[in-house]
Structures are given as structure tokens and as C-alpha cells.
Amino acid sequence: MGGIREKKAEYFAKLREYLEEYKSLFVVGVDNVSSQQMHEVRKELRGRAVVLMGKNTMVRRAIRGFLSDLPDFEKLLPFVKGNVGFVFTNEPLTEIKNVIVSNRVAAPARAGAVAPEDIWVRAVNTGMEPGKTSFFQALGVPTKIARGTIEIVSDVKVVDAGNKVGQSEASLLNLLNISPFTFGLTVVQVYDNGQVFPSSILDITDEELVSHFVSAVSTIASISLAIGYPTLPSVGHTLINNYKDLLAVAIAASYHYPEIEDLVDRIENPEKYAAAAPAATSAASGDAAPAEEAAAEEEEESDDDMGFGLFD
């Protein structure tokens, strides 16, 4: 009895030490994870993060005991359920998450297991004898006999994502040596500096954030302009639009000031500027003409040279 109490006290002390030392942690699911996989994950995280497992009742009791000093960790309590553990770190969260979820192993289908994604049987020659054709037909898998063996003629989805694998489907997948499941640690929730959020947040890239920000600014500016309510994103557009209106009123009222004299001159004397444009174009073409003539002469000389060889 004394040994159990000592172990609990030791666990509580270690959990508190990690909660105070590390600013971030992952709540990880460890269903169907082998001890070898856990060993590999610990090995890859060594020096960057620490893994701590424990019974949920003991973890909840420990956290509740720390709440007077560490109130932010109350947010973790709803996620301490099922087969879970903790990974503590001060390293970049995305990097640690990638290490956590990367160690996965393939596993055969079991009747009653829930498919995490669609399970397909691909078109392939199975190498099986024709006597097992009825087994495929019962599951709606199209087959033909090719060179004395059963061949699946097209891809077939045998289990939809989220559905349970039936006994027949499990038998078929195992018969074909298809291991549709992968088992490994999963990230249930992330805690970082007092905030708790799902791991999908870590998948958002900087480019996506910038894109969403630019889109939001554009939307705010459009709405602000439409309702005539000034906001920081719309002020620049408002000033430009108002200045255009000011120019239009000034020109219509023949009220000229130095900053618009050039614009007024272009409006009142368009032919002057229209004549200047062809002149500039002809000048450019005139400069190009001698260059083209020189190039043509060089080509002629080159062609003439080609008529003579060393032995003529």
C-alpha cells in the first residue's frame, strides 16, 4: 500500500514538474499502439520532448490538485478520457506533431473495426484458383478467369469511411493480403501557453494565413465603401475616389489650379498629344531602320563568303 502511494506521489510530482517546465503539450491517443512504436517515438523525440503516460483518474486528480497554482490546465480535463497520454515540449509544435504522427504501422482488417477511410480492392490478378470465384461474387467484386486464376477486373470500394468492417469484407481483405489500417499515435488536442486547440490548426500555412488576411481586408474595404462607413482598409480608396470627384467638379466649373493644369491641357488640346505619339513611334522606327539595313548587308557578305572554300 505504501509503495502505491509513493508511486502516485512520484507521478504527481513529475506531472507538475513537466507542466511548469514546458509551455506546450499534446494530448495523444494511443489506441492499438504497440510498445515498440512507443519506444520509437520516445527515441525520435529524445532531447526535444518527453512522453508521459498514466491512468486517466490519476491524471485528472493530479491536475485538479494543481488548479490553484496552475488554473489554465483545467482546460485539459475534458480531453483526459480514453486511452491517452501527454507529450510535453518547448520546440516548434508543427515539428513535434510531425514526429508524433509519422510512426505508423500497417495492420490487417478486423471485423467490427471502423474504417478511417474508404477501403478499396484494386483490379489485379489474385493468383487464386477459380473455385473461390463465388466468394468474390458474394461481395460484388467483378472477376474473370485469366490463365487459370481469378482476376479482379475493376476497382471496387468494399467499405465506406466511418463504417464497420464486416466479417466477409475482413476475410476478403485478409485473403488478398490487404492491410487497410494503420496504427500509431494520434494528436487529440494541443495546449500552448494557456490555449487549447485541435491539431488541425497546426496544418495552416503562413501562405494560407496571408491569403485569408488579404481576402478579409478586401471584403472590409468593399463593404465600407458600399455603406459609406470609413475604415482603415477603405480610407485609401475613399481618398482616391473623392479626389477624382474633386477633379471632375473643378474641370466642369473651369476652376483651374496648378496641380491640374497639365490634365486640363490634355483635355482641351487632345490633338497636340495625339500628334506627339506618332512622332515618337516614327522616331523609334527610324532608329531601327539603319540597324536592319546594316544587318541585311552583313547577311549578304556572309552569304558571299560561303561560296569560297580552302580548296577553290
UniProtKB/Swiss-Prot annotation:
The modification Phosphoserine is found at S68, S302. It comes from the Eukaryota. Pfam families: Ribosomal_60s (PF00428), Ribosomal_L10 (PF00466), RL10P_insert (PF17777). Residues 278-312 are annotated as: Disordered. GO terms for molecular function: large ribosomal subunit rRNA binding; structural constituent of ribosome. Keywords: Cytoplasm, Isopeptide bond, Phosphoprotein, Ribonucleoprotein, Ribosomal protein, Ubl conjugation. It is found in: Cytoplasm. Residues 294-306 have a biased composition (Acidic residues). GO terms for cellular component: 90S preribosome; cytoplasm; cytosolic large ribosomal subunit. There is a cross-link at K14, K97, K144 (Glycyl lysine isopeptide (Lys-Gly) (interchain with G-Cter in ubiquitin)). Residues 231-258 are annotated as: Interaction with P1B-P2A. Component of the ribosome, a large ribonucleoprotein complex responsible for the synthesis of proteins in the cell. The small ribosomal subunit (SSU) binds messenger RNAs (mRNAs) and translates the encoded message by selecting cognate aminoacyl-transfer RNA (tRNA) molecules. The large subunit (LSU) contains the ribosomal catalytic site termed the peptidyl transferase center (PTC), which catalyzes the formation of peptide bonds, thereby polymerizing the amino acids delivered by tRNAs into a polypeptide chain. Belongs to the universal ribosomal protein uL10 family. This is Large ribosomal subunit protein uL10. It comes from Saccharomyces cerevisiae (strain ATCC 204508 / S288c). The gene is RPP0.
